[in-house]
């Protein structure tokens, strides 16, 4: 590759000989900063906490002009260095083999142009070779021009046929569009395997109503290359390698059928956020949140209004959770806001920790704002606005100024699968203090009062799985050590409210299942006992059931008829 004529994604493969494969890696110094486009992988300078810096390989996900400074931002100091012209364009990078939480916007001056750069792999040509289209004998007369574009009538037939095929849930007979939402729920619940199909907006709306994501959720787990959400394929994502419908020359005369590229773009810009994990939601739109006295860096995309996108800091009232673009507006709001605790019933108070029960139907605005905040830290959360079917249990810590939110978990009012947690989160400024375990323990205390076995909504994310495994292990091992007689799996489940599947999962993960005298037994190894002793030796908070003042809420059929 000649330094005088750098390769660009548009110019690759357009050499003197047609069909010549373009190099996938550009050597250092053979390209310029203008050649860095979304999709390439390049080395980026990453500052470290110790004051040093290292070069990390990163993928460019998006670019944008450098945002203008906010009118509320403080002026730069007089001795500040002059801005680098390369920083006029910012690049959103994902560090390869690092967690998605570390994705960030960087200026052009942090790109290492002296090292090699990898071009994005071409996807169109290999797929055309791997999936040749079946030739169909055409009954229409051939045209003199020899153009491959079919007539409008044939195009309409082909487009409508492709759209009907895309709406089928199984290879059998076609399913009406009104039943697609129901079929998607059955497929996700595991009743029968579901084939790939293109999702319509009706599907995504039905999926949003039934999917409140776990804090821990994996999909998901759900893990992509860095432990986060991947594209939905078996659940109904659009496979761009299959059935492409060409657009006619006269769009006005065409039926309301889109090509794959148009459909993906439509979903990306106006469709349900459930389908856009790999598009818009890959790019974080907020940098920091100011919640009370804590300034927190966001981890993931959250669908706040576009007017607030890419602000340096979004200011949030820690009591009513309303959001403002400047500290001045927040101060004006705080002078009028009278809320000092979550707007619900306090059902637990002990040692400064309180739990409030909030009905999503009665406090829609507050719960929606809570979901928007939690989406900044939960990559797999897909439900933001339909909060009516859920109860929210918010944990707070009390001081002289009020009850400050620490974390929460949501719970379906009526769960067919028996889940006792739909989404769970401890705010980052309060993590690693044992509050996550308190949330998990409190959810099981509610299940004990209900007299039911409970389990978090599956699948769990990496952090959620670690937290639940630690809780399950502690409770199961503690019960086995305190028992002076043989105890069955059913007795463990009834005393802890942990489901049989979660008990078996924990025992298998700890290698506690042994085969002895023609039966399976639970055997506590020395390593498990030693780890349990170390855990119990640490001082930690615990839920005291005597301070729980709560009865399971009962809802009428009319109260559970959400959206009808």
Curated annotation (Swiss-Prot):
Sites of N6-acetyllysine modification: 381
Compositional bias ranges of the Basic and acidic residues kind: 113-128
Annotated site residue numbers, Important for catalytic activity: 423
Record-annotated active site: 457
Signal peptide start-end: none
Domain MYST-type HAT: 281-552
Molecular function GO terms recorded: chromatin binding; histone acetyltransferase activity; histone H3K4 acetyltransferase activity; peptide 2-hydroxyisobutyryltransferase activity; peptide butyryltransferase activity; peptide crotonyltransferase activity; transcription coregulator activity; zinc ion binding
BP terms from Gene Ontology: DNA repair; DNA repair-dependent chromatin remodeling; positive regulation of heterochromatin formation; regulation of transcription by RNA polymerase II
Biased composition (Pro residues): 72-83
Zinc finger (C2HC MYST-type): 314-339
Annotated spans, Disordered: 1-31, 47-88, 113-259
Family membership noted in the UniProt record: Belongs to the MYST (SAS/MOZ) family.
Domain observations: The ESA1-RPD3 motif is common to ESA1 and RPD3 and is required for ESA1 histone acetyl-transferase (HAT) activity and RPD3 histone deacetylase (HDAC) activity.
Quaternary assembly: Component of the NuA4 histone acetyltransferase complex.
Protein name: Histone acetyltransferase ESA1
Upper classification of the organism: Eukaryota, Fungi, Dikarya, Basidiomycota, Agaricomycotina
Gene for this chain: ESA1
């Amino acid at each position: 590759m000649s330094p005088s004529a750098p390769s660009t994604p548009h110019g690759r493969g357009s050499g003197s000989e047609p069909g010549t494969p373009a190099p996938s890696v550009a050597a250092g110094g053979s390209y310029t900063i203008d050649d860095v486009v979304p999709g390439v992988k390049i080395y980026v300078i990453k500052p470290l906490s110790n004051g040093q810096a290292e070069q990390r390989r990163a993928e460019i996900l998006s670019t944008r002009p450098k945002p203008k400074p906010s009118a509320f931002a403080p002026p730069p100091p007089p001795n500040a260095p002059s801005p680098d012209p390369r920083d006029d364009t910012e690049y959103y990078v994902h560090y390869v083999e690092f967690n998605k939480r570390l994705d960030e916007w960087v200026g052009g001056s942090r790109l290492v142009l002296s090292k090699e750069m990898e071009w994005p792999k071409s996807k169109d040509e290999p797929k055309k070779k791997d999936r040749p289209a079946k030739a169909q004998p055409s009954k229409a007369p051939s045209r003199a021009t020899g153009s491959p574009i079919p007539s409008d009538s044939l195009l309409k037939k082909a487009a409508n046929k492709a759209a009907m095929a895309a709406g089928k849930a199984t290879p059998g007979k076609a399913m009406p569009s009104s039943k697609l939402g129901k079929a998607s729920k059955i497929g996700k619940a595991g009743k029968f395997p579901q084939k790939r199909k293109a999702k319509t907006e009706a599907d995504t709306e039905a999926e949003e109503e039934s999917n409140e994501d776990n804090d821990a959720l994996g999909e998901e787990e759900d893990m992509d290359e860095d432990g986060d959400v991947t594209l939905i394929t078996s659940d109904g994502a659009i496979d761009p390698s299959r059935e492409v419908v060409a657009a006619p020359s006269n769009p006005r005369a065409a039926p309301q059928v889109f090509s794959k590229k148009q459909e993906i773009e439509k979903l990306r810009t106006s469709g349900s956020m459930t389908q856009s994990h790999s598009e818009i939601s890959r790019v974080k739109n907020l940098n920091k949140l100011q919640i009370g006295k804590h300034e927190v860096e966001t981890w993931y995309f959250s669908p706040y209004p576009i007017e607030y996108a890419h602000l340096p800091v979004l200011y949030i009232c820690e009591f009513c959770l309303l959001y403002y673009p400047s500290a001045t507006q927040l101060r004006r709001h705080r002078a009028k806001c009278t809320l000092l605790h979550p707007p619900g019933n306090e059902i637990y108070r002990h040692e400064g920790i309180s739990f409030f029960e909030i009905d999503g139907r009665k406090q829609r605005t507050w719960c929606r704002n809570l979901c928007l905040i939690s989406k900044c830290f939960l990559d797999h959360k897909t439900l933001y606005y339909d909060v009516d079917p859920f109860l929210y249990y918010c944990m707070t810590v009390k001081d002289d100024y009020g009850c400050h939110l620490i974390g929460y978990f949501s719970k379906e009012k009526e769960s067919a699968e028996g889940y006792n947690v739909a989404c769970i989160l401890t705010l980052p400024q309060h993590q690693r203090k044992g509050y996550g375990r308190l949330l998990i323990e409190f959810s099981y205390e509610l299940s004990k009062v209900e007299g039911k076995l409970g389990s978090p909504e599956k699948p769990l994310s990496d952090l959620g799985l670690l937290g639940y495994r630690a809780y399950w292990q502690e409770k199961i091992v503690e019960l086995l050590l305190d028992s002076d007689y043989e105890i069955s799996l059913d007795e463990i489940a009834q005393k802890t409210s942990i489901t049989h599947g979660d008990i078996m999962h924990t025992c298998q993960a700890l290698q506690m299942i042994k085969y002895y005298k023609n039966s399976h037994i639970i055997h506590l190894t020395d390593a498990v006992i030693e780890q349990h002793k170390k855990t119990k030796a640490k001082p930690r908070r615990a839920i005291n059931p005597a301070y729980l003042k709560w009865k399971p809420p009962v809802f009428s059929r009319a109260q559970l008829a959400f959206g009808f």
